[in-house]
Structures are given as C-alpha cells and as structure tokens.
Amino acid sequence: AEILMDLSELLEDGNKDLVIIYPGRFHPFHIGHGKVYKYLKQKYSNAKVFISTSGKVDGDRSPFTFEEKRKMMILAGVDSGAIVQTKSPYQSIEIMERFDKDKTVVVFAVSEKDMAEDPRFDFSNGLKLKKNGEPAYLQKWNSLDDAETFGTRGYIATTPTFKFKVRGQEINSASQIRNMIASSDDTMLTQMLQDLYSVTDVPQDIIDLFKNKVGNKETMNENWDEHSFSEFLKENVYEDNIMKKGILTTITEGKSPHKKGTKKYNAHMAAMH
C-alpha cells in the first residue's frame, strides 16, 4: 500500500509517467492472460497498461492473426484501447515511441514462471551488471521512487500465474488447450470456450475461428507453447544492446524501422518530427 501511495503522489506531481507493457504471443489469448491484465490495472492503477503482441502468423505454431487475438482479448475483458500490435512485443517500440523517454518509466510484465526459470532474471544481488561491469538496461522493478526513465533503463516486474480449468481440467500450457480443442466435437468446443473466456455466450466468430484453425488438426505442433520473455533473450545473444539500441535508436535518433524511401518510412519520419 505504501508503494502504491508513493506511486499516486509521484504521478500526480507529473514527475514521471508509468507505462506497463504485458508482451506475448498469445496463441490463444485466454482468461488466464485476461486476469493478468486486470491484476496489472489494479496494482498499477495510475499507470497506462498495454498488451503487446505481433501479427505474425506461422502455420500451426502461431495460427492467429492480430485481429483474431484482439477479439479474444476483448472477450477476456481487455479494454480495446490497451491492445497494441507490435513487430517485436518484447521491445514494443510502437508503444514506447508514444511517450517521452525522459519522463516515462517503462515496466515489462513477465510471469513468475519465466522469472524463476531464467538466470538472466536473477536479481538477487541487486543491480544486474553486464560482463563489462556496467549496469544492464533491464533491471528488476522496485518502485517509481528510484526508477530511471526508459532513456536510461527498462524494468521487469513479475505477474502471478492465474490458474483456471477447462472442462474440469487444470490448464498448464497452450499446447494442452490446443490438443483438447483438436479432439473435441462442436458441443465440447463451445463448453471449452465458455471456460477459456469465462463467458456463457461465446460469439459464433470465435467458435468458427477455433474450429477452423485448431479443431481440424489431427495433432498439434509441439512448439505451440508460449514463446516466453526468457526465450526471446536467449535468441538474442546481445539482448541488452538489442533492447536498448532497438528502442532508443528508433525513438531518440528518429531512425525508422522501415526501409528508406518507402511510404511507411516517410510516414514514420514525418511523425517523428
């Protein structure tokens, strides 16, 4: 409660804005994710909370488009204005460039499971250092009092995992959901989606979506699970440079992620100046 009070006072002073980003692949987005969003809104009541996901579609592994995931998010209780399509959710440049890098603190929300499984998230010795002894860009979130704005640093905060059941079975992974859907008939599918979104009336387009993209598959791709924040960092050996340079080059130097000369590039540059 004390931290939350400090947070309110600081935000009212207008010293620093707080932005919380909840990134993920979300294939599919479900009530467990929806509860994380609600938890973040409640815990950081004066912050702007966003859900960041890409529109990348990749066969069985990533079957849903951004618009399809957006529908699932709204069904799970997410405010439509909080949903942002980003090229790389774990950088979320498209969200960050809306804010002033010297007045805004950015926190990425990561699940407890991710934090526990990856040594990169071991902040037990206080400030996380790079090999050269300098502080790393991403640090553990404590409070707004001692937080740097995202021109200098980004933060990671943990979120609890909210358990839920689908047709009496506790859900532990995305693959489990997909395998259950793949082997269900129409009645079972509707019941599963009622549990998956905690609603009594499931819109027909959502039922059709799951039926067409998941229900007609004999077996699901083994790689179907969430691509976690720790996996993102493992894939990027120079993750610290990527996080900071990717975000800051675009925002501070006015460089566009689009190819020079294209309409998108020109529009991006016009928006920057």
Feature annotation, model-predicted:
Residues 34-37, 262, 272:
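Alpha-helical and His/Cys-centered functional microenvironments
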Residues 258, 265-273:
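Basic DNA-binding region of bZIP-type proteins
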Residues 187, 246-249, 259:
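Low-complexity intrinsically disordered segments
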Residues 223-224, 236-238, 254-261:
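Cleaved targeting-peptide boundary
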